[in-house]
Design a protein with these regions (language model features):
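Long, low-complexity intrinsically disordered regions enriched in Ser/Thr/Asp/Glu with frequent Gly/Pro
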Residues: 1-463
Length: 463
């Protein structure tokens, strides 16, 4: 997690110290640019037969697991990985535990895409009434009619972008205080900090992997990141309750970005450490299904070295996510998200099966040929260049870069000039950023101790 944190910090510093007309893209675009020397190998996505039965039936899940073992044998594999969302993973886990010998060569994984959606809802639930909802509406980042979908994790792309912008805005506010804090407590380090910011111009002017690696490896950045880490610790524990509460937002979004980065870069260790950070929050906010089965998932993954070393090697090589685009070095996505964008998208029909027939034999035929129809549809789209374009991620487009910068500045303006800056040392009580209403002692205790309560529940569940 520390390497991911340093990369995110450097991104924020580069964005903050770029030219007056912002030229450095937001989080995803920046990481694409600083991985320009990485070799990209596109993965092939295959379409499997469709089972004409309710997905949530235990018999259906059992059939999926059985078919997976048949595929393993056909491909002469030692073991095979099957990815489910939480609802199906719970049933599959129960079946595997009941028939351990039969399914000993099968490894179950929890879908990362659906896990992210759940964590987005946890973040929204914790912060929406503390001022987050009002801030993103007032700043114009999210329209009032769309804000519920963002905070509940249903509007995935908008939610991710919203939290990236809020995360960057809060870090910029923290950096304002960091400069004065450094002058007061670490005057002897001021020349090193100034030297780093002077050298940062090279990365601002030429955002590429070579410059990025050189900056990360520099002693001056190591010292700046250490100092900023100390200042963030002060904001968490020595700057009042309001600062502590909103630093938990920064930490939660840091975890969210770590989970995204783990999938996009194929970093298995970062993926596991991010999941372990999410579990206590699921316990704290009563998302018990994910809390229980993510705990089981972490336990299973921690024993892969003894039980399935071949699978562990495959996952460490990035096999737990899928490279859909051959031009994007930061473009791997979770397996369950890949299914949403390929299999589900190509298999669906207008109105479902009821849209063309209610006759059982016709519906049965529809499902029997679904894999072939979907495969041919995907090939036809590729031939006709439907949904195809020369690669340029939208975060790299000048209009999006300008819009992102404008939205970040708008959030900062709302917090500094209209409402409350959560890192203001004069604000010691836990209050709503937009209304200034002080939380009751019971509410303060619940909010500030939420993660500790979640960690205790997680420990009790494991024991």
């Amino acid at each position: 997690m520390e390497r991911s944190w340093k990369k995110n910090l450097l991104w924020i510093l580069v964005r903050l110290h770029a030219s007056e007309k912002q030229s450095v893209p937001s989080w995803t675009g920046f990481n694409i640019l600083v991985r320009n020397d990485h070799e990209v190998v596109k993965d092939n996505v295959g379409y499997l037969p469709t089972i004409n039965a309710p997905a949530t039936n235990m018999s259906t899940v059992y059939e999926v697991l059985t078919k997976s073992l048949q595929i393993k044998d056909t491909l002469n594999l030692q073991s095979i990985v099957v990815v489910f969302d939480e609802a199906l993973c719970a049933k599959a886990t129960e079946i595997k535990w009941k028939h351990r010998e039969q399914f000993k060569d099968l490894v179950l994984r929890m879908g990362v895409f659906h896990t992210i959606c759940t964590f987005l809802s946890v973040i929204g639930k914790r912060f929406q009434d503390a001022g987050l909802r009002d801030v993103i509406i007032e700043s114009g980042v999210i329209a009032e009619g769309s804000v519920s979908g963002v905070l509940e994790g249903r509007a995935y792309n908008r939610a991710i972008r919203c939290h990236k912008l809020m995360f960057e805005a809060l870090n910029r506010l923290a950096l304002i205080g960091f400069n004065s804090w450094t002058d007061e407590h670490h005057k002897d380090k001021k020349p090193i900090v100034d030297e780093f910011f002077k050298g940062l111009k090279a990365l601002c002017n030429k955002t590429c992997e070579q410059e990025f690696k050189a900056t990360v490896a520099s002693p001056s950045f190591e010292e700046v990141s250490r100092l900023f880490g100390s200042y963030m610790h002060y904001l968490r524990h020595g700057n009042g309750k309001l600062s502590k509460f909103w630093m938990s937002y920064v930490d939660m979004v840091e975890t969210l970005l770590g989970l995204l980065r783990g999938s996009r870069e194929g970093d298995w260790e970062l993926h596991l450490s991010s999941i372990s950070e999410i579990v206590p929050w699921c316990f704290a906010y009563d998302n018990l299904n994910y809390a229980r089965y993510l705990s089981a998932y972490l336990h299973e993954m921690s024993h892969l070295l003894e039980e399935h070393p071949d699978i562990l090697e495959y996952l460490r090589s990035g096999g737990f996510s899928v490279q859909m685009n051959e031009d994007n070095p930061f473009g791997r996505i979770p397996v369950d998200q890949t299914c949403e964008e390929t299999v589900n998208n190509d298999t669906q029909s207008s109105g479902g099966t009821k849209g063309f027939s209610l006759r059982p034999n016709v519906v049965s035929k529809f499902y029997l040929v679904a894999e072939y129809r979907s495969t041919f549809l995907r090939q036809l789209k590729d031939i006709l260049h439907i949904n195809w374009s020369s690669f340029q991620h939208k975060d790299l487009q000048p209009t999006r870069i300008a819009r992102d910068e404008s939205d970040v500045k708008s959030i900062i303006s709302v917090l500094q000039n209209t409402w409350l800056n959560p890192f203001n040392p004069d604000l010691r009580d836990l209050v709503c950023l937009s209304t200034g209403k002080v939380a009751t002692p019971n509410v303060q205790h619940d909010l500030l101790q939420a993660k500790d309560v979640g960690e205790k529940a997680y420990k009790a569940f494991r024991d």
